[in-house]
Each structure stands twice: as structure tokens, then as C-alpha cells.
């Protein structure tokens, strides 16, 4: 049930389904100011509009791509070797880090020397860990506050813009109606941004490297980018950028293997996971994490207290600061990009959970609550927070300050324990920022819709606009097996109100460890929620993809409808259940309404009639009604006719 040595030592390979390009898509790269800034995007090719609808060219659209080299046919994928270290030269060029002679963590050294783990170890890493030079700070926030625009920031600006300006220009040159087409396809509704950057309805508003730098310097955005994870493609989490989503993976003591977790990671990023958290709690946590990081183009997060607990055989009361500190260094030297640390679970808050319906539901929160009660002392995470900051800034690990007292039921939403912890997280944010350490704040949980905005508003106030990262929230507790939907509702709302990253929930939430199918279902649901939030905020260019799909739908370009959507495979499968023949891919109807009741076909018939008569569509409808009225009188003015 746990790690399979034979698989890892001899047969480790990437799942073929994760490396095939999506239909009608290809990986393209946009080059920045230097040749090694090559920003990946997915180009989706579209068919020409049928002659009957104008016959214009439909240029490709570009969408944000998290899949890394896996969907690039030109890339050589070997998970035993790992991904290329694309940020290595940038890190070295800054001249503020040093390569260590070996591992610093005692546990890391023990694992490296243990012959029992030899067959499980990742074989492809041939470099020692890196750390800041003495007295140096290597965080992206530190650089931003020094006025430095790093290659990572330039990369992010290009990535966030998704070639919108080029797309609009390609529409203008698509034919005689190009200018009209560009105006139509570039149109978007003004959003309501709730205090975030107001871009209005300007689809061409540009995200600049300077804007990225300024947001990071202010603490309103983070770039999770450990110097020991040079394989990662820079991305940003902040409410003035595209809403991001996280996918949780990880083994447990009773199920899954290292190979399965690597597969889940590559599967999650294929469908749009912006970051991945490895929440492994079973055997071989260290080795599992190494395989995942070395093969991940997206930031990896962890909850270090989980592994620390394994080191004391699951006895929370036996945890010590020294064990936890060693775990932080171990994981930082592997390349973990952000740590969830439940430093806000203070002794004084634990009694406040006594009258809850569901108590403390966070694993990390319950571990720290148990430790506090066993020792009747303040949490060592809280007491040693400044020392944790010193470790974080030596590797550029970002804080994800954990909501250990989040509500686990609607009943417990917005209670004193939850909000007390949130206030403490705001205080800890200020301490981290004093060290130029990047911070995001974790949020609930289970919250009914009418209380969601209060959560967002309090977080913005108490945490001084540090990015919010929420699990849903789930808006009702009555749907086990459908909690990706109960939470997707809350996720779309809180994303609109200002949350920067949404942690996905799968259909297995509360029921079991998700498999690959569950991971995909959760990812697609949350991509949908995040995109809905971007639309509602009026984020630049958010509506481009919607407009392209709507145009394809109206023109019955079925393949384009499938391919522009979030899940081409499912869309095609559903269509083909009832209309499987190739001829149905060009038909002007689907099985919902059939050939005679398709509203879009009827609209097109009206337009065609208008063109033939040389009148406007409104006049055509009026003229058509007059013709039908004459026919009605001629047939006897009877509503019903006997057959």
C-alpha cells in the first residue's frame, strides 16, 4: 500500500495521459528581456467561421498554462532526472546565496545515510542545497522593497497578460470586419472589485513588471519561489492578479504510494492547479516530497508539523521546537516553496472551541492545541516565530499562516475562536514583514453565504491586505459526495470579494483520500470558480475566453466549443453520448433541442431572412410576423385545425 521500491528504482515514469497536449492546443513561449525568460502559454487553435456566418478567420486564443514541460512535445520527460532548473542562473546571478557542503538538517542526513531508503530516493539530483549568505535576505519581497525587478517578476507580468494585446491585434487583421470583430471579442463587463485594483472594463489593461514589484513590496502579493526549487515557473498570488487555485495531494498511513502522488501532481497541473500541497502523513514523507518537488513546475506547499509529528511517533505532546526547526530546514533545503504554520493557535483560544458543534477540525490546529494543553504553555510556533522568520528568509520560503481554528461546520462559522486566531495571524504578518518574509493567510472552512464577505473584510483589515487563501468555503453541510460544489459556490463568492487563492475541494472531501479522477473534478470546479471571480472583479481580459466560446457556440463550431472549455474531454464525451457521428460535429443543433427548436439556429434564420429582405433584424421579425398573420387568416383564423 505504501511506496513501491521496484516502481521507483526501475520503472518510474510519467503517466502518458498527463503529457499529451490538449486537443487543438500547443505550447508556445513568449520571450522576455533576456533569452532565458521564456514564458509558457497554451495556444488554442480555432476553425474559421463558416461562410454562411461571415467566413472570417478566428485567430488562436491564449490561456494560462500550469502544465510545465509535460505538455510540450519537444520536451524530454524523465521523472527520474526531474525538470530543468530554469531559475538557476537568475538565483546565481544575484550573488547573495551560497551552495552548502551538504544537508544541514539532522533528519535529512539520517535519511540520506539509511540503506533502507536507498531504493526509494530520487536519483536525479546532483546538486547540494543553497542558502542565503550570512547577513543576506533572498526573498522576492526583500528585492521588491529594494526597488529591484527580478526576472521572476518580469516572467509573471508576461504570464498574467496572456498575450491579450496580440490577440486583439490579430482580430483586427483577420479580414474586412476585423475592427468590428476586435471590438466585439475584446468587450467585457465592468467588474466590482471591492477595493482591489479597478481595471474597469479595459481588457487591454497591462500588468507590468513594476506593478508586480509594487504589489509584492506592499505585501499584497507573494511569489512562492524557494531558491532550492529552481525548476518552478514563477507565479504570483494576490488579489490584483488572476485568482489562483491549489490542489492538495499526499499519501496517508493507509493508502497511496510515491508513484501515485507524483501522478496526481502531474495530473493536477495538467488541468490547471497553480500550486500543489503535499499533505503526506504516511511512510516515506521525505522521499515522496523529493520526487514531487524535482518534477514540479508549480510551487509546492507543505504542513511541516505533519512530518514533525511522524518523527515523535504521532504523540503531539512529545513535539519540541528543536524537532520542528530541523523539519523546517530539511524541507526548505529540499525546495518547499511555502509552509503552512499554525502559529495562531494560542493556548487562550483552545477553550473557546469547547462549545463548537465540530470542535477543531484542522489537523495542524488539533496537534498544536493538544500540545498547548498537555504542557499548559503557549505554542512553540508562536513563541519562536521570529526564529522561524530567520529560516524562511534564508531560503525564500513563504508563510501560509494556517487557520488551525477554522470552522468545520456552518454552525461554528465566524465564532470567537476563528476570529481570535485571525487577529493573531494579522499580528504575525507584521512580524514576518519586518523580516521581508512573504505571507499569505489561510481562511475557512464552512461559512454560509451571508457571512462570507464579513470573513473577507475582516481579513483585509486585520491582516493588512496580505493575500487570503481559503478552503472553499463550503456553504452548506448537507452534501457529502458533492462538497466540490458546496465549496465551489463559496469559492466563487470569496474570490470575487478578494481572496487571492482558492484551495480546491474534491468530491471525496470528508469521505476519503482523492484519486486522480477526484483531483481532476476538484481542479475543474475550482478553475470555474476562480474564473467566475475574475469576471466579477473585471480583471483585464477575463472575458476573452468566454467571448471566444460563445462565438463558437453561436456558429456551431462544436470542436472549438469543446477545446476552448475547461474540460474538452468531458464536453466531447457528453455531446457524443447522443450524437456520436462526425457529421454531428458540424450540425446546427444538439440533442437538447433537436434541429427544429434550436434557439441559436432560429436566430440565425432571422438574420438570414433580414439580409435577404434588406432590413434590420427587428424589422425582419416584424415582417415575419406580418407574413404569418396573413397565413393565419387565409387558413380560416382557427387556432386548432382538425386533421
Swiss-Prot record:
Binding site for substrate: 248, 277, 306, 342, 362-364, 403-406, 442, 469
The protein's enzyme class: lyase
Swiss-Prot/TrEMBL keywords: 4Fe-4S, Iron, Iron-sulfur, Lyase, Metal-binding, S-adenosyl-L-methionine, Thiamine biosynthesis, Zinc
InterPro entries (alphabetical): ThiC, ThiC-associated_dom, ThiC/Bza_core_dom, ThiC/BzaA/B
Keyword RNA-binding: no
Keyword Cell division part of the UniProt annotation: no
Catalytic activity line of the entry: 5-amino-1-(5-phospho-beta-D-ribosyl)imidazole + S-adenosyl-L-methionine = 4-amino-2-methyl-5-(phosphooxymethyl)pyrimidine + CO + 5'-deoxyadenosine + formate + L-methionine + 3 H(+)
Chain positions recorded as [4Fe-4S] cluster binding sites: 590, 593, 598
Protein family per UniProt: Belongs to the ThiC family.
HAMAP family the UniProt entry points to: ThiC
Entry protein name: Phosphomethylpyrimidine synthase
Species annotation: Burkholderia cenocepacia (strain ATCC BAA-245 / DSM 16553 / LMG 16656 / NCTC 13227 / J2315 / CF5610)
Upper classification of the organism: Bacteria, Pseudomonadati, Pseudomonadota, Betaproteobacteria, Burkholderiales
